[in-house]
């Protein structure tokens, strides 16, 4: 592994008050981020930090497509599979952990490489987080109870009336984010998106946002093959084991794509073929939303998904000051 000195000296941690220099590698699900990340880490002397909100869960390494044991052995990886299914993690809490991890990596003379597909994580990391006042837990409980009563579709429609911009960014079944946006609007009188535009904290990190440009026609057959490989290699057994650890359908870990469909199969709400079809449709829709989100980021640097050399080169010439 080459020394970082060819890129301006050994990586050094920034003072606590300064944004930490990092490289961000993003893209839609199934676009080949893991392979590209390993190539960048090997070429530049990096360590990988997970930036995918589903890959934080310990019970679902296969279903959430976490790096394999062989891939994990190629270089140090951080923030993968550390959270129980019953727990949730906010973007702000993740960013704090990612920042602390990046600081440790820099202190070792290595480059922090953030890898994933969760746009909100990258937004929080590179642009800060909205400093929203605390919401009364009773208000949260009231909206949660109402969601149970009328369903997520109706609540999503309500969100579309008070915060149409945010409603277009989240899935109508994303119960946690729907409740969060509605409670913030009710508590503050301002839409969730207003807070993210006008009350942002200091960004914890700084660096390029490299995005794999994987169009849907290219992605679709890859997503289908990956799903079939997951199912053939024991995805349902993994879900069944997770159910023994957390028998709560509303637990945060069960809300992700793949986890929710597998749970529906295990509960007898879907047959196997219907489960696979829904899983694939939802994965495709998610990839489309990811592409839409990243295309709206003016700082994104788009790169071919099937050319890791191009990704390595782009990362090398865009290293932020301090690494």
From Swiss-Prot:
Gene Ontology BP, a term: tRNA modification
A GO MF label: tRNA dimethylallyltransferase activity
Region (Interaction with substrate tRNA): 52-55, 176-180
Keyword ATP-binding: yes
InterPro entries the UniProt entry points to: Dimethylallyltransferase, IPT, P-loop_NTPase
Swiss-Prot/TrEMBL site (Interaction with substrate tRNA) positions: 118
Descriptive protein name: tRNA dimethylallyltransferase
Organism ancestry: Bacteria, Pseudomonadati, Thermodesulfobacteriota, Desulfovibrionia, Desulfovibrionales
Gene: miaA
